[in-house]
């Protein structure tokens, strides 16, 4: 199964994403590391899955074990505030920030690597 087909079946459709696109190489394979085009609302949904231990609207999307692995220091998310705030960045400054102790997910679609940094330091 192609990567994008797998994600549509097990992630995008189950959480209600309908407008997602992914860049592909000349052979038609998705470029997994970059090129995901997603609405900000859907990026927040993705973050909320992690905030809620792998569930979205009480439906299991990811295993708790996977969520724990992703939050492990140095694995996938950057950590701030002594490990209680998590941030994952994308190309051109896109960010999703998860703050479990405040029950919050914040998403940012920027255009430039320093957009988010400039916003948070002003």
Predicted regions and their residues:
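Carbohydrate-binding/catalytic loop surfaces
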Residues: 25-38, 81-83, 89-91
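Active-site helix/loop module of the DD-peptidase/beta-lactamase fold
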Residues: 2-34
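Short, gly/Ser/Thr-rich active-site loops of penicillin-recognizing serine hydrolases
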Residues: 117-122
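Structural helix-adjacent loops and short alpha-helical linkers that scaffold large soluble proteins
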Residues: 1-8, 54-62
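Active-site Gly/Thr loop motif
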Residues: 17-19, 63-116
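Non-transmembrane alpha-helical segments in soluble domains
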Residues: 7-8, 12, 44-51, 67-71, ...
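Active-site-proximal alpha-helical segments within enzyme catalytic domains
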Residues: 34-55, 94-111
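C-terminal, helix-dominated tail/subdomain
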Residues: 40-43, 57-71
